[in-house]
């Protein structure tokens, strides 16, 4: 099963997926993006495409609930592609050394992310492998 192709069929871009447990129930979440924003109808359409396929080829074992959602303005960045699609956005990063950074993503290559410090405008480059946790954020 190719989630990226199925999302494309619904006019969406696959962003990420995850399996979580909430209140003792398994939830399989599929996060999507779309130029101009994801609407509720987009999520419903993709859910209608995925449900019969997942009935035959479940993405996880056992009973679960399927959720289709926009990845949101403030979203987790866990793949190098996520950083590449987020150039010029603000990000909060925790490094493997537990250093906390708030910066703007300036550029991304195969292994590195270049950031601009929000306070000093100083540029720094981090190895993707040194990033423990990252999330975009919006200043209101």
From Swiss-Prot:
Keyword Cytoplasm: yes
Primary localization class, coarse: cytoplasm
Keywords associated with the record: Cytoplasm, Ribosome biogenesis
Keyword Glycoprotein attributed: no
InterPro entries reported for this sequence: Ribosome_maturation_RimP (IPR003728), RimP_C (IPR028998), RimP_C_sf (IPR036847), RimP_N (IPR028989), RimP_N_sf (IPR035956)
HAMAP family documented for this protein: RimP (MF_01077)
Protein name per Swiss-Prot or TrEMBL: Ribosome maturation factor RimP
Organism in which the protein naturally occurs: Campylobacter lari (strain RM2100 / D67 / ATCC BAA-1060)
Taxonomic placement: Bacteria, Pseudomonadati, Campylobacterota, Epsilonproteobacteria, Campylobacterales
